[in-house]
Regions:
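Membrane-embedded architecture of ER/inner-membrane glycosylation machinery
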Residues: 2-4, 177, 298-591
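Membrane-integral, polyisoprenol-dependent glycosyltransferases
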Residues: 1-364, 369, 385, 389, ...
Length: 591
């Protein structure tokens, strides 16, 4: 059942509150370790110091994208202090808003049940939750791209679209205005992607629907001009501050180098094959990725005019973003985040379709003869099988995990398994084993949830009840998310963080003394230090050396330094070996 705009808005506010509360339960104050966004926290320091227009990564170069994220993070630091939750807050709020507007749009354009499952599959998929806890701008970009795409759908839908109320001129103009604002904010978040991604979505949709003339409508073109004006306002202001150096940095580093091969002048980082994002998208959408074959079957069997208009748009939305990043030369994993909201909507559509199909078949069975029902049942059989198989896979996995966890609680972990794993996986397994040994309540809650999920899945499969099957997947998705991000990850962070070492360094070094860092900097060490560590790339003991009296270095780097260059430094503090880089040392120059 579709709902009115007013009611959908009220329910979206409730969805935002519940989503944000869920994110707050996932240990947002856990210590930082090696998150990429922590390396960029120096820009927040610079904004707080007063360099608002063109902040720099302290220590480091000027920012590589517009600073909307760092502006909002600076406001949160003012409110909550220099803490982990302050830097994570912008991403958490953006993620909650993304779920809320997905829910609101699906309620209006499709129905409330699709809206519920779309929002829940987005909120509880691994990739989206992980990004929501990262102190960087990607969740904000995903929010504005999602908002712009949805606004375009409201503005560009056909006048006789049966899936929602016919569009009028006022609704079209409101939709385009909202799209312009969202794209402008997207530019202020991560540059050209803020306008390019929604533009590709709208363009592909119009091409697929053979509405080529609409691409050249004055109001649509004007929408992009307004968005550019909003975004370019920062670029003009930053050029006034940074001059030619800023212009060259933006054009060469952040536009040209990311999309061309290294041999043609590109940067050559995050280079991966065309199919790179496919397995990562499937893995990142766990456990809901089990339903993707059902999504494909449903869309293929109803291709053309049989598909609801909202689903056609959502398919174009996902395809435009996914194909764009797949063809890009640089493919950093986090780039694909804006593709997850449409993927969640497709999942919600399919879950709703499975539930409706089951209910329609029950009604038909009661009112019709067997022969009259054979055609529609044959048409939907492959879809129903794919949906049931997906549920069965998740059910088996949930039961297997519950049994394995109980076995570890009772018998402990078999010897010889841990050394064969990746170091990070080994640490996770060690933490899991310690939770089992201590009979952690969180672990028993997870076991109970997986057992309940398995039971619900089995009952749903026996009754051929898609709604109960979906609930079984939701149970394990929620419980797994809370355990992974609220229990295991914070525990691992406590083991791997340099927070305590940074605080000990701050207590040891006399106030006012500069502290340097030898070689590659540790991002969390910079975050937890009272002031950014000055980077140096070699130790020197000659009298002309201007090295600070205190230097932080990785022990392996200090040990491999020439004796003549390290003879004048002595270690006075040593951290535990928290990661594969080993211990860190605080060195003091010998007078």
């Amino acid at each position: 059942m579709r709902v009115s705009l007013r009611r959908a808005s009220t329910e979206a506010i409730a969805a935002f509150i519940l989503t944000f509360a869920f994110l707050l339960a996932l240990a947002p104050s856990a210590p930082f370790t090696r998150e990429l966004g922590v390396c960029e926290s120096g820009a927040v320091r610079d904004v707080i110091a007063g360099n608002i227009i063109l902040p720099h990564f302290l220590p480091g170069p000027m920012v590589h994208v517009p600073p909307l994220y760092w502006w909002t993070a600076a406001l949160d630091v003012r409110a909550f202090g220099w803490t982990e939750i302050a830097l994570r807050m912008p991403s958490m709020i953006a993620a909650a808003f993304t779920c809320a507007i997905v829910f609101m749009w699906a309620s209006i354009a499709i129905n409330r049940r699709t809206a519920f499952w779309s929002a829940m599959s987005l909120l509880t998929c691994h990739f989206f939750l992980d990004a929501a806890r990262q102190p960087r701008m990607d969740s904000m970009l995903a929010l504005f791209v999602t908002a712009a795409a949805i606004a375009f759908e409201r503005a560009l839908r056909p006048s006789r679209d049966d899936s929602s109320a016919p569009i009028d001129l006022r609704s079209r103009h409101v939709g385009l205005a909202l799209a312009a604002i969202a794209m402008g904010l997207g530019i202020l978040t991560k540059g050209i992607l803020g306008i390019l991604l929604p533009g590709l979505v709208a363009g592909l949709y119009l091409v697929v629907r053979r509405r080529i003339r609409d691409l050249f409508r004055i109001d649509l073109i004007f929408t992009f001009f307004v968005a550019l004006a909003i975004g370019l306002s920062w670029y003009f202001a930053a050029y006034e501050v940074g001059g030619q150096k800023f212009l060259q940095w933006q054009l060469t580093m952040n536009l040209w180098s990311r999309f061309v091969p290294a041999e043609a002048g590109g940067a050559g980082y995050c280079v991966h094959p065309f199919w790179y994002f496919t397995p990562h998208t499937i893995a990142g959408f766990i456990p809901w990725s089990a339903y993707l074959p059902a999504v494909a079957i449903y869309a293929w069997r109803r291709r053309g005019r049989k598909l609801p208009e909202a689903m056609v748009f959502t398919l174009c939305w996902f395809a435009a973003i996914f194909l764009f990043f797949s063809t890009s030369r640089g493919k950093c994993l986090i780039y694909i985040l804006p593709a997850f909201p449409p993927l969640a909507v497709l999942t919600g559509i399919v879950i709703d379709a499975a539930i409706c199909s089951r209910r329609e078949s029950e009604i038909s069975a009661a009112d019709s003869t067997v022969g009259a029902n054979q055609a529609p049942e044959a048409r939907d059989r492959a879809f129903a099988i794919a949906f049931a198989v997906a549920t069965a896979v998740v059910t088996v996995a949930a039961i297997a995990f519950a049994l394995a966890a109980l076995a570890i609680v009772i018998f402990s972990l078999p010897r010889g398994l841990s050394p064969q794993l990746h170091p990070t996986d080994r640490r996770f397994l060690e933490l899991f084993t310690s939770l089992a040994a201590s009979r952690s309540p969180a672990l028993f809650v997870l076991i109970a949830a997986c057992s309940a999920s398995g039971v619900a899945g089995i009952i749903g499969l026996r009754r051929r009840d898609p709604q109960l099957q979906s609930v079984s997947v939701l149970i394990v998705a929620v419980a797994g998310s809370i355990f992974w991000f609220g229990v295991l990850n914070p525990a691992l962070a406590e083991r791997e963080t340099l927070r305590d070492f940074a605080r000990e360094v701050a207590r040891t070094v006399p106030s006012g003394n500069e502290v340097a860092h030898l070689g590659l900097s540790d991002c969390d060490l910079n975050f937890y230090s009272p002031q950014p560590l000055t980077p140096i790339y070699r130790l020197r003991c000659d009298e002309s050396s201007s090295s600070p009296d205190f230097v932080v270095a990785r022990k392996v780097d200090f040990d491999t330094t020439r004796v003549a260059n390290r003879a004048c430094f002595k270690p006075i503090l040593e951290s535990p070996p928290v990661d594969s880089n080993g211990s860190r040392l605080l060195l003091q120059r010998i007078p």
